[in-house]
């Protein structure tokens, strides 16, 4: 192939609508994290969008250098499209063909690249466009793909579904996608914004039990009294009755009962989900956290005597067993090791606690995760190991992290209380005076930053330009 032809082919590739041009890895810390999120979504979306998942897995295989495996995933996607969308097979296959072209390009098989570029061109030319067309089905496919990736892709997924609905406002699939994206983006503060799309999606998809549980979760989070609270419970019960073996329904229903402070019901549902996917790290993690909630329930009851202690240790044992299975299945899971460490500390197993704290410190953590770890380890040093100086050190390290969070405020409060307690015993305590000076300096810096931000907003200097909104 001549250089001109190769350049022309590369130009055509860049115009294709597919995973290789959607920038799906943007903002990801690593390929492992990205893969983990995708597999997390894969295992629970176990009935629908199988072709979408095959395309996404093909992209992941390519990123890992497994191009032959990627091609096998794409072949499977083609088969599924023929089964699921026989009447729209050409339009629905455009993304898959684009992925084929890119994989073959990276394999150096340019003649095969040309075959798939031509297949895309043949379909697009029917709509007076060479290599890409505006199609609600393509927008929908991109939307589901971005939803599977989660995180910072949810906002873009919502835009895709909104765009698709402009052309087909009553389409059940597009409406479901918009509802799920709205649910994910409406975390805090809870508002009516996700309720209406969910209700509309359920009207158009009355057999989609997963949507019903999402609506129940949103209603519960709104904390509305009376009818809507009862409506949420009814929705979950109906979903479980009609879809008793669907893992995404089971898991989301378990979340509903956890939020209602009913850990036993949540554990029952999560264990049922484990029957279908027994080695899933996330399910074991959630079961462990439910047992941890039961630990705190027993501690709050302040049961005395041997029975209370025995019950506490039994619950800690169940929590630890499931959390260890989660850690063994996926040692990158967020917070698992620090939770394990805290549970071992409650059971007076300090060597095990120290081991898991240090394992968590060895990981690459987000700012908030680092703050939480410093808070938990500081508490361990303060209350179990009776080492106030180490506790102070970790609370200070956590507060130094430039991230607003509840954990940061808790550590500031603890430092304040420790310093005041020490000064009440010794007014010249240098460590306590140092802590108070540190907190005073920190508060002054934060106040100055807030004032600078307000001045910037008033002057308009922080308002983004039109080009920034367009991603330029």
UniProtKB/Swiss-Prot annotation:
Q: Where is the composition biased (Polar residues)?
A: 462-472
Per the record, what is the consequence of mutating residue 255 to E?
Significantly impairs RNA-binding
Which processes are annotated in GO (biological process)?
antiviral innate immune response; apoptotic mitochondrial changes; defense response to virus; negative regulation of protein binding; positive regulation of apoptotic process; response to virus
Does the keyword Signal feature in the UniProt annotation?
no
InterPro entries, from UniProt?
A: TPR-like_helical_dom_sf, TPR_rpt
| Recorded consequence of changing residue 410 to E | Abolishes RNA-binding
Cite the Gene3D superfamilies for this sequence.
Tetratricopeptide repeat domain
Keyword line: Acetylation, Antiviral defense, Apoptosis, Cytoplasm, Endoplasmic reticulum, Immunity, Innate immunity, Repeat, RNA-binding, TPR repeat
Q: Where in the cell is it found?
A: Cytoplasm; Endoplasmic reticulum
Q: Where is this region: Disordered?
A: 446-472
Chaperone found in the keyword field: no
Which regions does the record annotate with the repeat TPR?
Answer: 51-89, 90-135, 136-171, 172-208, 247-280, 281-335, 336-366, 367-405, 406-448
A GO molecular-function annotation: RNA binding
**Highest taxon, organism lineage:** Eukaryota
Cross-referenced SUPFAM superfamilies? TPR-like
A Pfam family that the UniProt record links to this protein: TPR_8
**What does the record say about induction?**
By type I interferons, dsRNAs and viruses.
Sites bearing N-acetylserine, chain numbering? 2
Family annotation (SMART domains): TPR
State the GO CC annotations: cytoplasm; cytosol; endoplasmic reticulum
Biological role? IFN-induced antiviral protein which inhibits expression of viral messenger RNAs lacking 2'-O-methylation of the 5' cap. The ribose 2'-O-methylation would provide a molecular signature to distinguish between self and non-self mRNAs by the host during viral infection. Viruses evolved several ways to evade this restriction system such as encoding their own 2'-O-methylase for their mRNAs or by stealing host cap containing the 2'-O-methylation (cap snatching mechanism). Binds AU-rich viral RNAs, with or without 5' triphosphorylation, RNA-binding is required for antiviral activity.
Q: Which PANTHER family match?
A: INTERFERON-INDUCED PROTEIN WITH TETRATRICOPEPTIDE REPEATS, INTERFERON-INDUCED PROTEIN WITH TETRATRICOPEPTIDE REPEATS 2
* Oligomeric and partner information: Domain-swapped homodimer. Component of an interferon-dependent multiprotein complex, at least composed of IFIT1, IFIT2 and IFIT3. Interacts with IFIT1 and IFIT3. Interacts with STING1/MITA and disrupts its interaction with MAVS or TBK1. Interacts with EIF3E and EIF3C.
Please state what the annotation says regarding this protein's domains: The C-terminal part folds into a super-helical structure and has an extensively positively-charged nucleotide-binding channel on its inner surface.
The similarity annotation says:
Belongs to the IFIT family.
Entry protein name? Interferon-induced protein with tetratricopeptide repeats 2
């Amino acid at each position: 192939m001549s250089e001109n032809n190769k350049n022309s082919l590369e130009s055509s590739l860049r115009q294709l609508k597919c995973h290789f041009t959607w920038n799906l890895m943007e903002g990801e810390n690593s390929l492992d994290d990205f893969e983990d999120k995708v597999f997390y979504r894969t295992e629970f979306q176990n009935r629908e969008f199988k072709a979408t998942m095959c395309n996404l897995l093909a992209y992941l295989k390519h990123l890992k250098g497994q191009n032959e495996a990627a091609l096998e995933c794409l072949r499977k996607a083609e088969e599924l499209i023929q089964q699921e969308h026989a009447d729209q097979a050409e339009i629905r296959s455009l993304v898959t063909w684009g992925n084929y072209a890119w994989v073959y390009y990276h394999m150096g098989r340019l003649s095969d690249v040309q075959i798939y570029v031509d297949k895309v061109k043949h379909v697009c030319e029917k709509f007076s466009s060479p290599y890409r067309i505006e199609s609600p089905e393509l927008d929908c496919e991109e939307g589901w793909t971005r939803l599977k990736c989660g995180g910072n892709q949810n906002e873009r997924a919502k835009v895709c579904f909104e765009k698709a609905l402009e052309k087909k406002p009553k389409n059940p699939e597009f409406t479901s996608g918009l509802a799920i994206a709205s649910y994910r983006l409406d975390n805090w503060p809870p508002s009516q914004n996700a309720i209406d799309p969910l209700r509309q999606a359920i009207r158009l998809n009355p057999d989609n039990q997963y949507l019903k549980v999402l609506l129940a979760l949103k209603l519960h989070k709104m904390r509305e009294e009376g009818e809507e609270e009862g409506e949420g419970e009814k929705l979950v019960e109906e979903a479980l009755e009609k879809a008793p073996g669907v893992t995404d329904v089971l898991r989301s229903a378990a979340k509903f009962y956890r939020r209602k402070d009913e850990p036993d019901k949540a554990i029952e549902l999560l264990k049922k989900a484990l029957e279908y996917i027994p080695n899933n790290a996330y399910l074991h993690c959630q079961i462990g956290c439910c047992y941890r909630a039961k630990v705190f329930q027993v501690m709050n009851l302040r049961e005395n005597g041997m029975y209370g202690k025995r019950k506490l240790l039994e619950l800690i044992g169940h929590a630890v067993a499931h959390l260890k299975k989660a850690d063994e299945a996926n040692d990158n899971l967020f917070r698992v090791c620090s939770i394990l460490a805290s549970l071992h500390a409650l059971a007076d197993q300090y060597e095990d606690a120290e081991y898991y704290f240090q394992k968590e410190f060895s990981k690459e953590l987000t700012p908030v995760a680092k703050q939480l770890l410093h808070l938990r380890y500081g508490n361990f040093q303060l209350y179990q190991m009776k080492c106030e100086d180490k506790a102070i050190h970790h609370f200070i390290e956590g507060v130094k992290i430039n991230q607003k969070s509840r954990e940061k405020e808790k550590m500031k409060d603890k430092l304040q209380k420790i310093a005041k307690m020490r000064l009440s015993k010794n007014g010249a305590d240098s460590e306590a005076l140092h802590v108070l000076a540190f907190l005073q300096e920190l508060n002054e810096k934060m106040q100055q930053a807030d004032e600078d931000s307000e001045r910037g907003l008033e002057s308009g200097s922080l308002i983004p330009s039109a080009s920034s909104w367009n991603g330029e």
